[in-house]
Amino acid sequence: EFAKNNTKGSIVNFSSTYGCGSPIPSMYVDGEKHIGYGVSKAGVIQLTKHLSTHLAPNIRVNCVSPGGVRFEQDDDFVKRYSEHTPMKRMMNVNELNGLLNFLCSEESSYVTGENVKVDGGWTSW
């Protein structure tokens, strides 16, 4: 309905780096991260690609896949996570703002179907 009634616009979906690769089991002391999480996040990335081809040229559809965001995790988890990230830390909550502003603006008028990973290099290993 959104696409039928609009001549231009931008949709930004959210996934996760776990939609791009498997979690590291040793990071989770209470057991492995459930497979359903990664499967659902991979589905969001595929949905983004599908919608980007079906809603173009008027509606752009992109996805942002953040890595770990620092927010009330215990210090041991933050340390384990940070050891696996080239930037040696978790993301701060405001570090997606510039990217989101870009993807929602006309400055990204030719960007569609992309999954942008913002993970401090996590998926570069």
Identify the role of each PLM range.
Residues E72-P86, M90:
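A short C-terminal helix-loop "cap" of Rossmann-like NAD(P)-dependent dehydrogenase/epimerase domains
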Residues T85-L96, E107:
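A conserved structural motif in NAD(P)-dependent oxidoreductases
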Residues V29-D30, N101, T112-W125:
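Short C-terminal tail/terminal secondary-structure segment
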Residues S15, R60-R70, L100, C104, ...:
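Conserved SDR Rossmann-fold cofactor-binding beta-strand/turn motif
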Residues E1, E106:
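Conserved N-box asparagine in the HATPase_c
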Residues A3-K4, V12-A56, G68-V69:
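Catalytic loop of short-chain dehydrogenase/reductase
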Residues T7, S108-V111:
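Glycine/proline-rich active-site loop of Rossmann-fold NAD(P)-dependent oxidoreductases
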Residues A56-R60, V111-G113:
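Short, small/polar-rich loop/turn modules that mediate ligand/substrate recognition or access, typified
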